[in-house]
Amino acid sequence: MPVVFRERGFRFHFYSDEGDPREPLHIHVYKNGIDAKLWLYPEVVYANNHGFDARTQRWIVTVVQDRRGEIERTWHDHFGTGA
């Protein structure tokens, strides 16, 4: 499970086995037993959320938007796909 970064105790990561065929670019977020998955394109939106409150969800979206380039580079480096 490649961890892209950690911020405020949240782990932003993806899994090495992201489906066959592989799912589109996305990020998983985890903290204290709560998790969510966000699609990165065409805009940052939740695929699912299992317990984060509305304020935390807004903060997560902002972080993912701000660091989308880093997430995308890490994804492509890991899977060997072109950007």
Question: What are these regions, as identified by a protein language model?
Answer:
Residues 1-23:
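Short, charged/polar N-terminal "headpieces" of proteins
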Residues 15-54:
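A short, structured beta-strand/loop element
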Residues 4, 35, 65-66:
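Intrinsically disordered, low-complexity sequence elements enriched in Ser/Thr/Gly/Pro
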Residues 5-9, 32, 73:
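A generic short-segment signal for beta-strand/edge and adjacent turn/coil regions
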Residues 1-2, 24, 33, 75-76:
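A broad, low-specificity signal for short, low-complexity segments enriched in glycine/proline
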